[in-house]
Amino acid sequence: MGDKNDKEDNLSLPKATVSKLIKEMLPQDVKCSNETRDLILECCVEFIHLISSEANDICGREQKRTIAAEHVIKALTELGFSDYTQKVSDVYDKHKLEVSTKSKSSKKFENLGKPTEQLIREQQLLFAKARSAFQASPEAQQLQQLQQQQQQQQGGLQAPSVQQQTDINTTTTSTIQK
């Protein structure tokens, strides 16, 4: 449907982010017009296209299928932006460190040294205890009484009493513990 130029026209950077960066870089007494902001935005997009195109070429020459950070750093050097390579490398190293730290913390609970079956039994025991505690609460007893009254009014079967339910839960809990 659309050609390559249509896709490129839709590619841009968030204006709010670019505006924020411009504001941070300029002295407080200097303002930036919308036209200037748009021009800077276009320049940034063009710069990204230039770097990514060169990184893609480097990637192709190395017969790789995925553009890596190293390709981007080489592209900066080959295009005459070697002044930026150290900063880019530093930011990339920091990013790798953050990702590895985040990955380690997400796996923190992965292997607690207990088999899955034991963890499931412990979870079921906790559920049974919570259920017993709730059923022993005054709110649960009131709810139970209301349900019994409704069933009696409807002529249905009588629900087990709170004591009967507690006995059932105690039996269930002791069975799970075994």
Swiss-Prot record:
It comes from Dictyostelium discoideum. Residues 139-178 are annotated as: Disordered. This is Protein Dr1 homolog. It comes from the Eukaryota. Its main location: nucleus. Belongs to the NC2 beta/DR1 family. Heterodimer with drap1 to form the negative cofactor 2 (NC2) complex. The keyword Transcription applies.
